[in-house]
């Protein structure tokens, strides 16, 4: 044995590999109010015990690595390590388990969603001992939440800016999403806004392409906003997509939007990235701009039930990073969305305090303390016949977006907007009168058709449209 080896042995360092569960599985651990808690759906490889799999997740997403290292002795693992403190089987799934992991707050940089995700989900999802892994939920403690600005303005400030109360807001995505010139695009915006919508929207992939450069689009949309406001007496907006290839270019576009005096800009927060999104949210708060968030790419991450990350986690991350609106599915339209699960993360977006409720997929009680709420946006394959259900499901604090359901009207954009506004006002009035939208919804819409030919035409066009496909990402036990 060499002198160096003898020296290392004499200080008690023992090289080699040991089971993760010996260090990182701690069922006796009592979680702290300052811990970030995570619920992982773990599918171990055959032969790997769930305790070892859960401990491996805790280790590889905090202080651990595959072998013992001598530098472990230079820090306090007991202070900094993640701990798998509970494991439970998933009902109806023999090979899946929910592993609960607690992370000490000191592992994370203040005010950084980027760092939080890099730690918790950055590396462990490719671990060979796991056949699949999904992050189902996070508990963000108030001590960490308070390090974030969150949404630039929040629900109440937005309503005050727009002077609109007592009903959902109405929007429309301009179609076709790609190919229009800036002038024709602005014309479509104007027709929709003058017809009664509160907002129109750039689609997620409208940035600055050869057929329509961003500056031209911003100018023509601003003209449409001001003209429709003058005609209707209502405050209007268009979500000008500031998403760009660099953060500097993104902020430049937001600056130009502010100079035009428009009320709101937009960002694709997953493809753009959390660092860019947080920077834009800070700019929007400092400069009085509302911020609409599109979740493009989310289904790549959240759609499969056994691997990836549930959208409720992405929704919480957005509330931390900052956004005044975010797309949240429809339940009734063309996009994936279980009703109870959707209502669960809608609560997490809007409410100040949300209790644990496994029937809605909420694994932890979440206290947002003073962080403003986010308006959920229902968008994707919806039309006037969906209005009663959308009003009943999402309530007043929401934005209902009818893209094809506005521009697909046989008489044009403005009549399509009129049809949606009339249907919404009829549903809100009926609800306020005590009528049950879930039971009487179709009858309420038919009654409104008697005094709105635009709505009658829309109802005729879309009376047979259905999107009857089973939900893939169902809650456990369904």
Curated annotation (Swiss-Prot):
Modification type Phosphoserine: residues: 208
Catalysed transformations (reactions): 2 (2R)-3-phosphoglycerate + 2 H(+) = D-ribulose 1,5-bisphosphate + CO2 + H2O; D-ribulose 1,5-bisphosphate + O2 = 2-phosphoglycolate + (2R)-3-phosphoglycerate + 2 H(+)
Keywords for this protein: Calvin cycle, Carbon dioxide fixation, Chloroplast, Disulfide bond, Lyase, Magnesium, Metal-binding, Monooxygenase, Oxidoreductase, Phosphoprotein, Photorespiration, Photosynthesis, Plastid
A Pfam cross-reference name: RuBisCO_large
Cofactor(s) required for function per UniProt: Mg(2+)
EC id: 4.1.1.39
Residues noted as binding substrate in the record, renumbered to the chain: 123, 173, 177, 295, 327, 379
Cofactor, how bound (note): Binds 1 Mg(2+) ion per subunit.
Protein's GO biological process: photorespiration; reductive pentose-phosphate cycle
Segments forming a coiled coil: none
Binding site for Mg(2+): 201, 203-204
CDD domains according to UniProt: RuBisCO_large_I
Location of Phosphothreonine modifications: 330
Modification after translation (UniProt): The disulfide bond which can form in the large chain dimeric partners within the hexadecamer appears to be associated with oxidative stress and protein turnover.
Residues bearing the modification N6-carboxylysine: 201
Residues carrying the site annotation Transition state stabilizer: 334
Intracellular or extracellular location(s): Plastid, Chloroplast
Further facts: The basic functional RuBisCO is composed of a large chain homodimer in a 'head-to-tail' conformation. In form I RuBisCO this homodimer is arranged in a barrel-like tetramer with the small subunits forming a tetrameric 'cap' on each end of the 'barrel'.
Subunit structure: Heterohexadecamer of 8 large chains and 8 small chains; disulfide-linked. The disulfide link is formed within the large subunit homodimers.
Recorded family membership: Belongs to the RuBisCO large chain family. Type I subfamily.
UniProt cross-references to HAMAP family, sorted A to Z: RuBisCO_L_type1
Function: RuBisCO catalyzes two reactions: the carboxylation of D-ribulose 1,5-bisphosphate, the primary event in carbon dioxide fixation, as well as the oxidative fragmentation of the pentose substrate in the photorespiration process. Both reactions occur simultaneously and in competition at the same active site.
Descriptive protein name: Ribulose bisphosphate carboxylase large chain
Gene source species: Lepidium virginicum
């Amino acid at each position: 044995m060499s002198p160096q080896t003898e020296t290392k042995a004499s200080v008690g360092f023992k090289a080699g590999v040991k089971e993760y569960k010996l260090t990182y599985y701690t069922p006796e651990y009592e979680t702290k109010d300052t811990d970030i808690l995570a619920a992982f759906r773990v599918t171990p490889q055959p032969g790997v015990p769930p305790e070892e799999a859960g401990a491996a997740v805790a280790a590889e997403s905090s202080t651990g690595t595959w072998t013992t290292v001598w530098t472990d002795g230079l820090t306090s693992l007991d202070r900094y390590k993640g701990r798998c403190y509970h494991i439970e089987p998933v009902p109806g799934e023999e090979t899946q388990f929910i592993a609960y992991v607690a992370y000490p707050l000191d592992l994370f940089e203040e005010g950084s969603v980027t760092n939080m995700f890099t730690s918790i989900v950055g590396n462990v999802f490719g671990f060979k001992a796991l056949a699949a892994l999904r992050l189902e939920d996070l508990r963000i403690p108030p001590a960490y939440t308070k390090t974030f600005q969150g949404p630039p303005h929040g629900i109440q400030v937005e309503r005050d800016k727009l002077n609109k109360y007592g009903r959902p807001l109405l929007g429309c995505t301009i179609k076709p999403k790609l190919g229009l010139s800036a002038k024709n695009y602005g014309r479509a915006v104007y027709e929709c806004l003058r017809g009664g919508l509160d907002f129109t929207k750039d689609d997620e992939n409208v940035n600055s392409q050869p057929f329509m450069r961003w500056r031209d689009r911003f100018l023509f949309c601003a003209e449409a906003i001001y003209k429709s406001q003058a005609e209707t007496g209502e405050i209007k907006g268009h979500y000008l997509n500031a998403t760009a290839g660099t953060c500097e270019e993104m902020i430049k576009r937001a600056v130009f939007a502010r100079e035009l005096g428009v009320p709101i800009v937009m960002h694709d927060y997953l493809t753009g990235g959390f660092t860019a999104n947080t920077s834009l949210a800070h700019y929007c708060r400092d400069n009085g701009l509302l911020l609409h968030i599109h979740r493009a790419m989310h289904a790549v991450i959240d759609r499969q039930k056994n691997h990836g990350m549930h959208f409720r986690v992405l929704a919480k991350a957005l509330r931390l990073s900052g956004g005044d609106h975010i797309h949240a599915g429809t339940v009734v339209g063309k996009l994936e969305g279980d009703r109870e699960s959707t209502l669960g993360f809608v609560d997490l977006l809007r409410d100040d305090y949300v209790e644990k409720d496994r029937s809605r997929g909420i694994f932890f009680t979440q206290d947002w303390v003073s962080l403003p709420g986010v308006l959920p946006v229902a968008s994707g394959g919806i039309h006037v016949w969906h209005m009663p259900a959308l009003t009943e499901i999402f309530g007043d604090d929401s934005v209902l977006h009818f893209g094809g359901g506005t521009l697909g009207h046989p008489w044009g954009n403005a009549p399509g907007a009129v049809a949606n506004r009339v249907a919404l006002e009829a549903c809100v009035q009926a609800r306020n009168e005590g009528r049950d939208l879930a039971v009487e919804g179709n009858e309420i819409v038919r009654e409104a058709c008697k005094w709105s030919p635009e709505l009658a035409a829309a109802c005729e066009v879309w009376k047979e449209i259905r999107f009857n496909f089973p939900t893939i990402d169902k809650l456990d036990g369904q």
